[in-house]
Amino acid sequence: PHVRDFAYKEDYEGEHRQKQIDLAIQLFEAMGIKRDDKEKRMDWMLRGFRQFDAPVSLVLTYDKYLEPAGITHFGLGALAYGIILSAWERGVGCVINGQGIMQSHIVRKHANIPDDQSIMICIAMGYPDDNFAANDVRSVRADNDELLTYVGF
């Protein structure tokens, strides 16, 4: 079972589950992993727990005192976005990795994170391998019209 420091929806349903499945299909097709190849699928999952074998993993945390931490989560998202844009501008690839914190107690132990901090997310960082098929996969994004409502413009 997943053991995270914050409340998290474990099992997606409906359109959110379908998006998750569609991305997995894209990824496994790009990498030549067949649906029934449990060994290669497991290897991919374990790679996520290893931060995709990246040389650097940032672990973003916040002070537990701030819980419930809605605005803090927003702030950490903005921080992650800034770090990622800056890194990519310098040729360093990044992957936001929620899988890497599914066992927060293990991350806490190995990264020496104090108990008064909640682990929010990891960012795997390194120079991209242009020959690695997974690096070419891009998830399908909704159009702005599906996400935004303009009032007064």
Predicted ranges, named:
Residues P1-F153:
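Acidic, surface-exposed loops and disordered segments
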